[in-house]
Regions:
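Transmembrane-helix signature of 12-pass secondary carriers
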Residues: 1-229
């Protein structure tokens, strides 16, 4: 890929030219790990709920509120982070959403009472609600047109992987040491993903739309070099 090429191609043509290669495979693994970690956070409460109800003597209504708290947070998070990523860029949300959901997920393990746990699960959902659309956007914007639909479907498969891991951990942990270790351990993958995501560049499409052409060209050259284009 020549240094002059991005000035004469449209963005979609430039992405097609840099092709599908090592960069996109790494990005899919990074996004996919985040999706798997989010699936664990969303589903683990359903596995932990019987033990929590027994420990705190929750009513059916309280159990229902605890089970849905994360989805209420996701509703708010999807709107907030989706809007923010269109205004200031994908990368900030790409990093912070995982930190938020894994951080509050970890704090959930130390909840002293029911109300605190509900609040922390809602805040966890606020992060999860942002991770899903922001990851989808940044991954899609690095994919060539011909492979875009197929690889976005591949990304969604990581959610199923996270669900299987959550079920396996719950089966191993909850009967032996209780629900708190399950919540703590399930937050660790997200913290690792947060650390790795700091090195992912901003979406070149976002940069072009906002007039930052030189930065976009530099990133496209980086992707081309990594893919051997």
């Amino acid at each position: 890929m020549t240094t002059a090429a991005p000035a004469t191609w449209t963005f979609e043509e430039a992405i097609d030219r840099v092709g599908l290669g090592r960069f996109q495979f790494k990005l899919m693994a990074i996004c996919g790990a985040g999706w798997a970690a989010d699936a664990m956070e969303v589903l683990l409460i359903s596995f932990a709920l019987p033990a929590i109800r027994q420990e705190w003597g929750l009513s059916t209504a309280q159990a229902g509120l605890l089970g849905t708290a994360i989805f209420l947070g996701m509703l708010a998070g999807a709107w907030f982070w989706g809007t923010l990523s269109d205004r200031i860029g994908r990368k900030l949300g790409f990093i912070l959403t995982v930190l938020i959901d894994s951080g509050f997920g970890l704090l959930s393990a130390f909840s002293p009472n029911f109300a605190t746990l509900v609040l922390l699960r809602a805040l966890t959902g606020f992060g999860v609600g942002g991770t899903l659309p922001v990851d989808y956007a940044i991954f899609a914007e690095y994919l060539p047109r011909k492979q875009r639909g197929r690889y976005l479907v591949y990304l969604e498969a990581f959610w199923a992987l996270g669900a299987l891991v959550a079920a396996g951990l719950a089966w191993l942990i909850v009967p032996r040491v209780g629900w708190r270790p399950l919540l703590a351990i399930s937050a660790l993958p997200g913290l690792i993903v947060f650390w790795i995501r700091r090195y992912v560049p901003e979406s070149p499409r976002f940069l072009l739309v906002h007039g930052r052409e030189e930065e976009a060209r530099a990133i496209l050259r980086q992707v081309a070099r990594e893919n051997g284009a």
